[in-house]
Amino acid sequence: MFKLKNKKMLKKIIIVIIIVGAIGGAYGLYVFFMPHRDVQSVEAFATISANDLVAEYLKDNAAANLKYLADDGDSKVLNITGRVSSIETDQKNQLVLILKDEGAAIGVSCTFMESTNKNAKKLKVGDVVKIKGVLRSGVDEDSEMLEEDVIIENCDVLS
């Protein structure tokens, strides 16, 4: 009788695990296939210069993160103006522009999408541009006092 009870309990536990796994898998697929936000069609939260955005982060990183970043992944869409200091291509063949004034230690890194690369290819170092994108990371200071640029993704050139 004792063995029979254990088999029934084991069967119930296995059924519960399968049900929970199926629900978790279904939710994972739902999130994976959910449409991504079209950054270019969303109204910008603010228009700000690259220098002012960097200065805001250097002044109070926590306050700037509260203002621009969101835990749910829907961080603020910004229009950023600044001078192009470098143009690079990342591993995904996406253009990455750095907006900062000459002599500035840090700036704003703007990563374009494959579909918007063509709009950024006409830009040259020294051009003053207005770019729309979503903020992903503020100024990052590590323990060695190295600072990373503010990171903007899904960018496109406005002017």
Model-predicted segments: where are they?
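OB-fold and OB-like single-stranded nucleic-acid-recognition modules
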Residues: F2-S159
